[in-house]
Amino acid sequence: SGRPSHVSVYAIGPIPLLIQFGSSLSNKITTDFYQKHRVRNTWKWSDGEGVALYETKKIQDGTAPNKVALILSLSGKIHLGSTGIAPEFSVYEIEVKDGELAPNFSFLKTRADLDRFRKAYADLVSRLGRDHAGVTEIHLYPAIPAPVAVTCGFDLLPKVHPNLVIYDADKTKGGFNQSLIVTRH
């Protein structure tokens, strides 16, 4: 058929582009995602289940039922006040709890850590579609490592999930700015 039966993804790049890249991958092919581990200087996952847990919470009730934003505080903490998100948006956050540590650059150590994020993310995206009928876009504010970015695009269901409006933090441009819109066809 000319299609590979398996793909391994070793991604490095700007987070918005990695989300877009993930959305272009076929979810009909078995795909593994890998993290470049800085301390150990390897792409190999550590053994075991890992300790990263993900807390999902609603941090702002918006005035418009179809305006939704999602903050991903994984590699670092994103504070609502730093985003410029308007009051009409309902805002949700997924935050990592890495044992006793707050969000940090080295939380993603095992494949299980990534799998738990993917479940939390998929559950929340589905919930947003149910709780905010008519939502066509989720405004996404990510502080996330590369494999998480790729899976954020990869795990969108074509013709089911809303588009992702991706924001990128850039201090030279005054904080978070819209970068691109990701659709999954």
Which role fits each region the language model picked out?
Residues 3-10, 31, 66-70, 90-92, ...:
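Hydrophobic beta-strand segments of well-ordered beta-sheets in folded domains
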Residues 10-14, 71-76, 141-145, 169-170:
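Structural motif
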Residues 2-44, 148-149:
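Hydrophobic, ordered structural segments
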Residues 50-123:
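Redox- and metal-dependent alpha/beta enzyme cores, enriched for Fe-S-associated oxidoreductases
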Residues 129-166:
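C-terminal structured domain segments
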Residues 29-57, 102-110, 163-164, 168-184:
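Long, charge-dense
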